[in-house]
Amino acid sequence: MRCVVYSIAKSSPLELVKIYQKQCRQFDCELELVDLFPKNTANAQKISKEFAQKSYSLAFEPYLNPKAKNIALHPKAQRGDSFAFSKMLENHLNINFFIAGAYGFEENFLKGCQAWSLSEMTFSHEVAKIVLCEQIYRALSIIFKHPYHK
């Protein structure tokens, strides 16, 4: 299994994420983080919400894979507990997660993904990545009946 978390962010190594990456390997899952921040994104964010959202879509579109499960994190999307999250991931070998910048996703981009919400609360990219990586590890623990999830 391969899970890739794509985010509109400048690179920021997170020690806790590295721990979850290592733990996911025991379930034969490669957890990878890819930070994208094209030059046009900074300018687009200064112009308008619409320009910013378009720049996020353009950055993410090459990574949308029709053979993978594509999941966009969106505060107004479906949410559930860790068991529901694990069901969503189960039986998929390639899973792509997308975390937009401050202005969120364009509606057109969301149509190509399943949307999921970690919370109604707003998180920094760093916190969202840590929560997501922990939940991926927890989902794998549930799927493989590992005692971590209890």
UniProtKB/Swiss-Prot annotation:
Q: Pfam families, from UniProt?
A: SPOUT_MTase (PF02590)
Member of which family?
A: Belongs to the RNA methyltransferase RlmH family.
Q: Which GO terms describe its molecular function?
A: rRNA (pseudouridine-N3-)-methyltransferase activity
Question: What EC number(s) would the UniProt record show?
Answer: 2.1.1.177
For this protein, the record's PANTHER family field holds: METHYLTRANSFERASE, RIBOSOMAL RNA LARGE SUBUNIT METHYLTRANSFERASE H
**Name of the gene encoding the protein in the UniProt record:** rlmH
What the entry lists under InterPro entries is as follows: Alpha/beta_knot_MTases (IPR029028), RlmH-like (IPR003742), tRNA_m1G_MTases_N (IPR029026)
Provide the function of this protein: Specifically methylates the pseudouridine at position 1915 (m3Psi1915) in 23S rRNA.
Q: How does it assemble?
A: Homodimer.
Localisation per UniProt entry? Cytoplasm
Q: Which residues bind S-adenosyl-L-methionine?
A: A100, L118, S119, E120, M121, T122, F123
Main subcellular location: cytoplasm
The UniProt catalytic activity note for this protein reads: pseudouridine(1915) in 23S rRNA + S-adenosyl-L-methionine = N(3)-methylpseudouridine(1915) in 23S rRNA + S-adenosyl-L-homocysteine + H(+)
Q: Which UniProt keywords apply?
A: Cytoplasm, Methyltransferase, rRNA processing, S-adenosyl-L-methionine, Transferase
Write down the HAMAP family for this protein, in alphabetical order.
23SrRNA_methyltr_H
GO cellular component annotations, sorted alphabetically? cytoplasm
UniProt protein name: Ribosomal RNA large subunit methyltransferase H
- EC class name: transferase
TM segment ranges: none
